Amino acid sequence: MNRPLLSVIVIAYDMSRQALNTLKSLAPSYQQNVNADDYEVILVENRSRRVMDAAAIASLPGNFRYFLRDEAGVSPAAAINFGFAQAQGQFIGLMIDGARMVTPGVIENVLMAFSLNENAMVCVPGYNLGEHEQQFHRSKGYT
């Protein structure tokens, strides 16, 4: 694989199902108008009682890399630094919360922004689905 244009670092802790949904939304089969060689996805998971399933990890696309780490503290800072050290892309994107799904054109649009200005600071807004914020979903009956 040639050097990708973009490295997307995803940090996860104790959210195996949500992290898998995030990864599916970043997959080349879901993203539009980009090739797998255009970007890589680096998942850094801090060990918890619910780590990602081995079969799910094995099914990740070829432009995905997975790292399971043992961290003493609760801060994601060490995982973020580790992810940056692994990144091979010319540009780097960071998803600190591994429970975020992205739209099918997000990688294309991020790459387009960097093609206009390689010093761009690109931010993708987050939205909650439903009437309530995500952190209250279980108390309101969402699963």
Q: What would you call each of these model-derived segments?
A:
Residues 5-7, 40:
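Cell-envelope/extracellular polymer assembly enzymes that use nucleotide-activated donors
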Residues 15-31:
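Short, well-formed alpha-helical segments that are part of the catalytic scaffolds
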Residues 21, 25, 78, 82, ...:
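Alpha-helical elements of Rossmann-like donor-binding domains used by nucleotide-donor carbohydrate transfer enzymes
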Residues 26-68:
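Acidic donor-binding segment of Leloir-type glycosyltransferases
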Residues 70-87:
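Glycine-rich, basic loop-to-helix element that forms the pyrophosphate-binding segment
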Residues 92:
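Short aromatic/hydrophobic "clamp" motif used to bind/position activated sugar donors
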Residues 96-100:
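The conserved acidic donor/metal-binding loop of glycosyltransferases
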Residues 104-142:
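Conserved donor NDP-sugar-binding/catalytic core segment of glycosyltransferases
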